[in-house]
Amino acid sequence: MEKPIIEFRNVSKKFGNKLPINNVSFTVKKNNITTLIGPNGAGKTTIVRLMLGLEKPTNGEIIIDPKLKIGYVPQKFGLTPDLPITVKKFLDLLAPSNFNSNIKEINSFIDLEHIKDQEISKLSGGQFQKVVLACSIVNKPDLIILDEPLQSLDVTSQQEFYQLINLIRKKLNITVFMISHDLFTVIKNSDQVICLNGHICCSGVPNEITPNSEFSNALSSLGFYTHHHDHRH
């Protein structure tokens, strides 16, 4: 069996008297799409900060290759709506040394050519998300972490986004770790789903989320109403 790209072993993190995550264990498999879901305050942000090395666990162990290259797209990406800079210039600022060679490969499946000269402020939600994806992979990471990437997208744009994610992981052999509240989309498009509420409530593959299953009941108890959907192909 191939070694997981990240492994949490009985990890707890304490901030003062608060314990946002307690005894959390899970693995992220290479080249999979793993999605972490949970209510507000469940500890999802703490998990990401631990993955990025911004926090250290109070207890437990996180096994991660120190050479692992990670691309991260936070929930609030930090671009102002009136940013007077073109898409090409923005990406060039991110990775000037290898932009030209890498962006050609990225452009072959993200298709930024027709928007490269547009200002960031003029982009639609779907177009902006393409730029965000390009930002996360322009330096060819082993893993990308996406925090709530679907929030401002309509249903059509969400599906286009997942199609791009699948192309990215297949063409560049990238592992994807995502945080989302959209259970329906998660079920259709993830290889593994982890439900967090301070601890791991349930985890598994989407086809295990069947009516009255332990997985489904755990999700329902947190306000995620489930019914069976076919796993993505």
UniProtKB/Swiss-Prot annotation:
Where is this chain's protein located in or outside the cell? Cell inner membrane
Looking at the record's lineage, which domain of life comes first? Bacteria
Q: Which residues are involved in binding ATP?
A: 38-45
Instruction: Identify the Pfam families for this entry.
Output: ABC_tran
SMART domains found in the cross-reference section: AAA
Q: Which UniProt keywords apply?
A: ATP-binding, Cell inner membrane, Cell membrane, Ion transport, Membrane, Nucleotide-binding, Translocase, Transport, Zinc, Zinc transport
Query: Which GO molecular function terms does the record list?
Result: ABC-type zinc transporter activity; ATP binding; ATP hydrolysis activity
| Entry EC number(s) | 7.2.2.20
Please list the residue ranges annotated as the ABC transporter domain.
Answer: 6-222
Described purpose of this protein according to its UniProt entry: Part of the ABC transporter complex ZnuABC involved in zinc import. Responsible for energy coupling to the transport system.
Q: Which family does it belong to?
A: Belongs to the ABC transporter superfamily. Zinc importer (TC 3.A.1.15.5) family.
Which protein, by its recorded name, is this? Zinc import ATP-binding protein ZnuC
